[in-house]
């Protein structure tokens, strides 16, 4: 259940203040003396009231009271005489005067003095009044509380008869209503209604006053909203209707549902119980339009999260991580030339929450040689340095306990610097931080202490001597003081040559504002105060002022620092800025630099990111350029965007810049410190303050403001209109574009009912502020309000207005409807809706599925498809085409089997359009076949040669064998013929011996023949075998050579094929990139055309902003698309190379296997080889 935030804006008012006490009252400036006044404070602490016998009741709003002091004895003789007349002599006044300081801004201050009967009452009232003022929370009370406050004011401002004049009431409603209407309304309420009538305060209750406001100023706008919620069917809202309204309109949809639960019936009933005046409706759980109106005007519907007004931020980060409320030339009450200096300004500025004030210190010229504060030689009046230090001591920690930085611009001699040091030491005491904290030594790389570390401490920002120089001069000072020499410790070093501070290149000019013209003469300077008075009285012309400006020459701050003052400088040591790179290398966090607005803008223009990084580490101070002699202010937002801590402004000028400053620093308990966003503090984050695209980690927002109506805007019958601006990053800043129509002759309750002013894309809500301002028909500001976007509440809200000095106006409010959403780019609304409400999205899809089932379509027949929000069919086709070349994972590309590789590269989704390469295809290539043919020819030629050699050797061997056989046959035949012839001649019986010899010879011949045959066969076998072996070796050699050539050729062909694949893929990628660029150009043109034709865009500035935003968005989107395409293409190329490498490795493996197989065949052949012959 959503819990109500308990806004405890009241401070406890002591009983003695409520009971009152009698004082004599006087004002010195206008000589007003009023004795025996009964002063009181109401129970809420709204008013300090007083009344004396025979006079009308008077009130002073406590919100306008700046300080309560013990008053000094008046110097005006008339006042003293008046007090003497009532029995209070001058001698009796010591310690009996209460000074009440009040004003609607920081410059126009009024002083009311109250003289008590005794010092005890004075002390009691000073403490009591101090305890109830500076109630910043009370500046944010609801419109209902403001009405009650106004009613109380009317009741206090009674006439001499102690009654409320009807005329006082008519003045409240003077604008837009005739007195007759008011008189009639009073009459209907049973109250006196004549023009000169009086009303008893007891009869004029708050409920009567509220009813009167509703009669005279009816809230028709809320009535219309009420009817819209209930459909104009009833006079009440039910609990369900109220819950629905609260969740749909009054709750920021971006909020966490656990930390900020939705409203439920129980919470709605609590609201009805609290705000519904009709008891019967309350019992029935219903709320009327009156109860609804009361609820909308209550604290529960504040325009900001009220806890942001408390101290809610962490205060333990280094000082450099905070924005610090800072003042420039704090002492001035007006212009920079001839202006008046005032000690009071220091009080007012510090009480307003400022934490850095400036003191321009110069040598006093009087006999007492007292240091003074003035604007150099710019014809401004002087104030005493010691008075300023006293004022700072009294007010530094009244409204905030966090550290105050005194920015010295030191032009004083060493003598007067010593006096300055002693004043700071003696008056501030323990408040002055004279030495660095032990936990945060002054060392490079060491972070600055936090605001919590420096609570109730005053730091001095001034140049510091080099450590060795400071030590040397301090020792000399100490030795001379111990020696008891007559020389004063303040001036013993006065004649020393000026020593360099930290280094010669580190001199810093706090105000290099005017560096032209000749220095003024001593005579001119002698008339400075007279000139200042002339300027104040308007006797000096603009030409005179311009002449003085032209002759003015800025005198830089001294570098001849007194060592005693130097020792008091620690965490705010100014140095001359030498560049961001130098500062980063030095890494000295306690060094800081000052930039006038022009120089600061120059660095922002050229080194924005470096400036942000610099401000993460050390502090920077920005101050107005010298040309702002009218004390106008620059726009601080641009420097907050860069993380500059001390964006110093002229507090005396309540212009737009100061309004932004005061509105921003109202958060975090008005303590003067605001923690910078995370990305502006972390060294690992990069932030460009000129970015036009959302920052990483930061969700952009859409903010729309519908201005519905205004209430009590003016007591005059005038026309009014409302402007709504936003300030933030340059891309978030929209000003002078959104304004309502003019509603004439009605300052009381104008109804604007404008269409919503939409700030469509706020990329950095943390730095953005909303400004709502009301102007009259003469373009004069009536009231304004600054609302930081990071604490803005959504819904129908009443926005109470402030004056130009940020003081709350009593009754004026603007009724608005504020809508806050997460920024959703065009075309993504459906997706975001589905994500934010998946149940609703699912219910729609389920309903459609049910409808399809009713038509006979089964759920299983419905495919799950991705959501497509594209409005461009061609874009969809392009996306489909791009999807065809999306690479798969590496696991899908990796071949898992030899067979898969042997069959070629598998089809890959990303590279499937590239022709596949298979080894079989390589072997069918013409070059390979031609090479095979050539190799076969070589092999055939060798075989033919071998066959010829075979034939030749075979013939030779056969001839040799035939010759041996023939010789054997011949010799055998010869022996047989001799035997035969002998047997014929001698007879068979006589030739036995011869026959026996012949047989022996034949046997011997046969044996010899066999031996010869055996020898020749062995020789032939050897020769034939050697020839066969030689032929086999030659054939094997040429086969090996051919195989190697085949492998090399296949590898070469594969590499060529790979190169062609790569080239084809490159061409495909080039074509793809070209198509994408053309498609992107087309989208950009179509989008620009759509914006130019969009009739809902009503002004040129918004159209240009949309085009600029579109171009920025498209640029980022297109670059991302191109980056993704390049990554995809790179991945495809890598995948292709990987597959090609795997294929090449496979081919080499296959080649090795072929060679191994051939070697095995060779070995088998050798093992099977036997001696052979052809015979």
Curated annotation (Swiss-Prot):
Q: Could you identify this protein by its name?
A: 1-phosphatidylinositol 4,5-bisphosphate phosphodiesterase beta-4
As cofactor, the record names: Ca(2+)
Sequence ranges assigned to domain PI-PLC X-box in this UniProt record: 313-463
The enzyme's E.C. designation: 3.1.4.11
* Effect on the protein upon substituting residue 339 to R: In ARCND2A; uncertain significance
Q: Which InterPro entries match?
A: C2_dom (IPR000008), C2_domain_sf (IPR035892), EF-hand-dom_pair (IPR011992), PI-PLC_fam (IPR001192), PLC-beta (IPR016280), PLC-beta_C (IPR014815), PLC-beta_C_sf (IPR042531), PLC-beta_PH (IPR037862)
Compartments annotated for it: namely: Cell membrane
A single Gene Ontology CC annotation of this entry is: plasma membrane
Q: Where is the active site?
A: 328, 375
Taxonomically, the superkingdom here is: Eukaryota
Function noted in UniProt: Activated phosphatidylinositol-specific phospholipase C enzymes catalyze the production of the second messenger molecules diacylglycerol (DAG) and inositol 1,4,5-trisphosphate (IP3) involved in G-protein coupled receptor signaling pathways. PLCB4 is a direct effector of the endothelin receptor signaling pathway that plays an essential role in lower jaw and middle ear structures development.
Question: Which species?
Answer: Homo sapiens (Human)
Polar residues biased stretches: 881-895, 1085-1094
- Phosphothreonine PTM positions read 886
Q: According to the entry, what is the taxonomic lineage of the organism?
A: Eukaryota, Metazoa, Chordata, Craniata, Vertebrata
A molecular function GO annotation: calcium ion binding
Q: Impact of altering residue 621 to L?
A: In ARCND2A; likely pathogenic
């Amino acid at each position: 259940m959503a819990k109500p935030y308990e806004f405890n804006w009241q401070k406890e008012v002591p009983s003695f203040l409520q009971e009152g006490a009698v004082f004599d009252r006087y004002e010195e400036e206008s000589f007003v003396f009023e004795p025996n006044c009964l002063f009181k404070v109401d129970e809420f602490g709204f008013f300090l009231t007083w009344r004396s016998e025979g006079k009308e009741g008077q009130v002073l709003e406590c919100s306008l009271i700046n300080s309560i002091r013990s008053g000094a004895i008046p110097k005006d003789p008339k006042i003293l005489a008046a007090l003497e007349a009532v029995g209070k002599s001058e001698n009796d006044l010591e310690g009996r005067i209460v000074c009440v300081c009040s004003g609607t801004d920081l410059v126009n201050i009024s002083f009311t003095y109250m003289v008590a009967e005794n010092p005890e009452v004075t002390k009691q009232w000073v403490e009591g009044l101090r305890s109830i003022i500076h109630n910043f929370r009370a500046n944010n009370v609801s419109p209902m509380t403001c009405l009650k406050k106004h009613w109380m004011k009317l009741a206090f401002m009674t006439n001499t008869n102690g009654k409320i004049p009807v005329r006082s009431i008519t003045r409240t409603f003077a604008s837009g209503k005739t007195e007759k209407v008011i008189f009639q309304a009073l009459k209907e309420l049973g109250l006196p209604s004549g023009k000169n009538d009086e009303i008893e305060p007891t009869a004029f209750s708050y409920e009567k006053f509220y009813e009167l406001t509703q009669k005279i100023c009816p809230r028709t706008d809320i009535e219309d909203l009420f009817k819209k919620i209930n459909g104009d069917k009833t006079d009440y809202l039910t609990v369900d209707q109220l819950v629905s309204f609260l969740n749909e309109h009054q709750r920021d949809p971006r909020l966490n549902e656990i930390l900020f639960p939705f409203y439920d019936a129980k919470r709605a009933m609590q609201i009805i119980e609290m705000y519904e005046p009709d008891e019967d409706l309350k019992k029935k759980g219903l709320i009327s339009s009156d109860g609804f109106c009361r609820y909308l005007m209550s604290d529960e519907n504040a325009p900001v999260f009220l806890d942001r007004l408390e101290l809610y931020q962490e205060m333990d980060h280094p000082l450099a991580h905070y924005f610090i409320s800072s003042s420039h030339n704090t002492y001035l009450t007006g212009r920079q030339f001839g202006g008046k200096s005032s000690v009071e300004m220091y009080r007012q500025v510090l009480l307003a929450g400022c934490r850095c004030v400036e003191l321009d210190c110069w040598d006093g010229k009087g006999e007492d040689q007292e240091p003074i504060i003035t604007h150099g030689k710019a014809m401004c009046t002087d104030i005493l340095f010691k008075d300023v230090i006293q004022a700072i001591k009294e007010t530094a920690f009244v409204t905030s306990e966090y550290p105050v930085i005194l920015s010295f611009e030191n032009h004083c001699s060493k003598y007067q610097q010593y006096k300055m040091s002693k004043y700071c030491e003696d008056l501030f005491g323990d408040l002055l931080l004279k030495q660095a904290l032990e936990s945060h030594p002054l060392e490079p790389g060491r972070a600055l202490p936090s605001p919590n570390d420096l609570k109730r401490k005053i730091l001095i920002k001034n140049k510091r001597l080099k450590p060795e120089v400071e030590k040397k001069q301090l020792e000399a000072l100490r030795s001379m003081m111990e020696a008891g020499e007559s020389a004063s410790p303040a001036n013993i070093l006065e004649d020393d040559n000026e020593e360099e501070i930290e280094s010669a290149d580190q001199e810093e000019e706090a105000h290099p504002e005017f560096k032209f013209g000749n220095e003024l003469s001593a005579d001119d300077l002698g008339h400075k105060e007279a000139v200042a008075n002339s300027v104040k009285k308007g006797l000096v012309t603009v030409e005179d002022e311009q002449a003085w400006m032209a002759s003015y020459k800025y005198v830089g701050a001294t570098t001849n620092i007194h060592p005693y003052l130097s020792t008091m400088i620690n965490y705010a040591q100014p140095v001359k800025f030498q560049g961001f790179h130098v500062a980063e290398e030095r890494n000295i966090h306690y060094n800081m630099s000052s930039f006038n607005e022009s120089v600061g803008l120059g660095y922002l223009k050229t080194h924005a990111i470096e400036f942000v990084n610099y401000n993460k580490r050390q502090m920077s101070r920005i101050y107005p350029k010298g040309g702002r002699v009218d004390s106008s202010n620059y726009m601080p937002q641009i420097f907050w965007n860069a993380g500059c801590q001390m964006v110093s402004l002229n507090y005396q000028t309540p212009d737009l810049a100061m309004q932004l400053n005061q509105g921003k620093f109202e958060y975090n308990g008005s303590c003067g410190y605001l923690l910078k966003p995370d990305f502006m503090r972390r060294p690992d984050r990069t932030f460009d303050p000129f970015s036009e695209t959302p920052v990483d980690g930061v969700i952009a927002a859409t903010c729309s403001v519908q201005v519905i109506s205004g209430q009590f805007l003016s007591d005059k019958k005038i026309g009014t209109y409302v402007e709504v601006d936003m300030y933030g990053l340059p891309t978030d800043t929209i000003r002078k574009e959104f304004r309502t129509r003019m509603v004439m002759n009605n300052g009381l309750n104008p109804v604007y009912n404008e269409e919503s002013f939409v700030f469509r894309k706020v990329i950095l809500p943390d730095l953005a502020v909303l400004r709502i301002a009301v102007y009259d028909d003469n373009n004069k500001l009536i009231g304004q309000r600054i609302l930081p976007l990071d604490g803005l509440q959504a819904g129908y809200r009443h926005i109470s207005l402030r004056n130009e000095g940020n003081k709350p106006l009593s009754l004026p409010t603007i009724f608005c409807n504020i809508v806050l959403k997460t920024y959703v780019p065009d075309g993504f609304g459906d997706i975001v809706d589905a994500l934010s409400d998946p149940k609703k999205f699912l219910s729609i899809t389920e309903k459609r599925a049910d409808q399809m089932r009713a038509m006979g379509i089964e759920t299983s027949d419905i495919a799950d498809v991705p959501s497509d929000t594209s409005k461009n069919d061609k874009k969809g086709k392009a996306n489909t085409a791009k999807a065809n070349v999306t690479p798969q994972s590496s696991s899908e590309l990796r071949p898992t089997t030899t067979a898969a590789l042997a069959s070629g590269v598998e089809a890959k989704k990303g590279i499937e359009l590239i022709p596949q390469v298979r080894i079989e295809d390589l072997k069918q290539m013409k070059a390979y076949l031609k090479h095979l043919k050539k190799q076969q020819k070589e092999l055939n030629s060798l075989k033919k040669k071998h066959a010829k050699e075979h034939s030749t050797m075979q013939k030779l061997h056969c001839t040799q064998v035939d010759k041996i056989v023939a010789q054997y046959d011949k010799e055998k035949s010869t022996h047989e013929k001799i035997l035969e012839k002998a047997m014929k001649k001698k007879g068979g019986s006589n030739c036995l011996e011869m026959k026996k010899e012949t047989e022996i010879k034949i046997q011997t011949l046969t044996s010899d023949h066999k031996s010869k045959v055996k020898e020749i066969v062995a020789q032939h076998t050897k020769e034939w075998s050697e020839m066969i072996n030689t032929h086999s070796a030659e054939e094997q050699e040429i086969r090996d050579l051919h195989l190697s050539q085949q492998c090399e050729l296949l590898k070469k062909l594969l590499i060529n094929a790979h190169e062609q694949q790569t080239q084809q893929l490159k061409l495909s990628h080039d074509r793809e990139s070209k198509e994408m660029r053309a498609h992107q150009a087309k989208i950009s043109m179509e989008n620009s055309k759509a914006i130019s034709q969009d009739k809902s865009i009503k002004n040129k500035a918004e159209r240009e902003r949309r085009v600029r935003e579109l171009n920025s968005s498209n640029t980022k989107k297109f670059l991302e698309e191109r980056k993704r395409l390049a990554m995809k293409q790179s991945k495809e190329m890598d995948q292709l190379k990987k597959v090609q490498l795997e294929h090449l490795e496979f081919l080499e493996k296959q080649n090795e296997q072929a060679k191994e197989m051939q070697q095995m065949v060779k070995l088998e052949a050798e093992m099977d080889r036997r001696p052979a012959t052809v015979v």
